[in-house]
Every structure is written in C-alpha cells, then in structure tokens.
Amino acid sequence: MDERPVLFFDSGIGGLTVLREARVLIPEIQFIYVADDAGFPYGNWEENILKEHILNIFTNLLTRYNPALCVIACNTVSTLMMADLRQKFPHVPFVGTVPAIKSAAEQTKSGFISVLATPGTVKRAYTNELINSFAGQCHVQLVGSEKLAGFAEDHLRGKTIDSEALRKEILPCFVKKNGKCTDVIVLACTHYPFLINFFREQALWSVEWIDPAKAIAKHIRSLLPLSEKIHQKPIKKYQDFALLTSKNITASTEHLLKGFGLKLMKRVDFRIRDQ
C-alpha cells in the first residue's frame, strides 16, 4: 500500500467536511490539510491572479510532501483550474469538488434546482457546462453568496451567527413558479455543510440539501490501492496535520483543528508572494 499522504487543500476550513468522510473510509491513510486562510475568501479574486497564486502554493507543497493524491476541497478552485493543476503536475492525481448538479437533476421531482455557491463558482463557465450537460430540462437557480463561507468559519470558531443575515443569503434559492417550487438545493461550497442546521431552520419550505462530501470520499478511496491486510484493522502510521498560510493563528483555530484530529504545524514557509 502506498504510504504517502493524501493532501487536502481549501481556502479555509470548509474542506474538513470532506476530510471527515474520507477518514471513515480510509482511516489508515495520513492526511495533510492545507488551508490558505491568508487568501480567504477566493470568491472575489481575479481569476489569473488566483491561478498563479494556487500554482505557486502547489509547487511548494508537492516538492515538500510528495503526496499520493491531492484533493482540491474548494469548489471555486475546482471549477476554475483543475486542468491547469493536472497539466502543470501530471505525475499527481487531483480530485476536485464541483457542484453536484447531476445528482440534483436525478433527485428533483419538481424540476426546480438551486445551486448555493460562492460568487466565483456561480460565474464559472464550467458550472454552466454542468447545467447544460446534466440539468438541461430543469430550472436551475444559481445563487452566489459572499457571506456564507465566512459565517461557516465563524460558526466553527464558536462565534454567534446572525440568523437574519443568513436567511437573506439563502432566500434566493427558494423559487416558486407555475405551481412548482424548488425541491433540491446543491451545497456547492465545502464550507456550507457546517451551516446545514441553520439552513434547515431558515428554509421557506422543506427541501433536499445535497452535500457531495461522501461521494467525493468514495472517489478518493477508489483511486488509492487497497490494503493487503484485509482481515486486520488498519493502523495509521503517521499523524494527520494541518498547515495554514496565515501567520496569524488564533487559539480558537488551533482548538478547532485539534477537534478534527489535526496537529497544527507552525512556522511553515509557503514562499507566497504578496498580491
């Protein structure tokens, strides 16, 4: 079995929703979680600048850690530049997180779907390609929120969430027309599942919320070789750890990562140029 780590990457803590599902399926694997909190949020970055920024980070990470596989646990980056990453680093498998529009189209009964994402994901051509390919017969409402990812970060650090402000962010997802209404909402940002209880409380009516984390974890598992010791409980040889690009690491952040079983590695130089 390949003992190299699996590297997760996100702009913040949203990718932890996918990491926790991957751990269930492959507990013996070492995971490295990288949060580019210095660059958070990605939704409003200029595309070319963001691409260069991400490629610089991965040039450093892949040299330093030689992962068996990289998970881009960020919808904004996944819809923007998976092809760029695969082209620049052809020796490394990359798994992306893209809006689960196909699943939504398969599950909807009304034909009304909403995609709750960041502004960056909403405006990507790739998102529209997914809609045209898998949901051409559906009414698809794209909703780009500038605040929800930040709300998720605050919530996990124990801060109070303004329920009314959150409600305003999700209201456009609820569409009613010609006697039909939205019945499926895609969570197209890995941060958003952390807010699912708030979403259900503030929803105008009952809907199916699609979190693709489990499906992504299964895909990750399928790309890794099976352990030869099938009848033995898998043993993790190396501790999981997290890296943050920001040098302003708070006690609440460190406590949060510890709660997810991640040791915070400090004083790591990412050699990122200031934008």
UniProtKB/Swiss-Prot annotation:
Top-rank lineage group of the source organism: Bacteria
SUPFAM superfamilies assigned to the protein according to its UniProt record, in alphabetical order: Aspartate/glutamate racemase (SSF53681)
Catalytic residues, chain numbering: 74, 189
A Pfam family hit: Asp_Glu_race
UniProt keyword terms in alphabetical order: Cell shape, Cell wall biogenesis/degradation, Isomerase, Peptidoglycan synthesis
Binding sites annotated in the UniProt record for substrate: 10-11, 42-43, 75-76, 190-191
Keyword Isomerase in record: yes
InterPro entries: Asp/Glu/hydantoin_racemase, Asp/Glu_race, Asp/Glu_racemase_AS_2, Glu_race
A biological process term (GO) from this entry: peptidoglycan biosynthetic process
Family membership: Belongs to the aspartate/glutamate racemases family.
Name recorded for this polypeptide: Glutamate racemase
Organism in which the protein naturally occurs: Bartonella tribocorum (strain CIP 105476 / IBS 506)
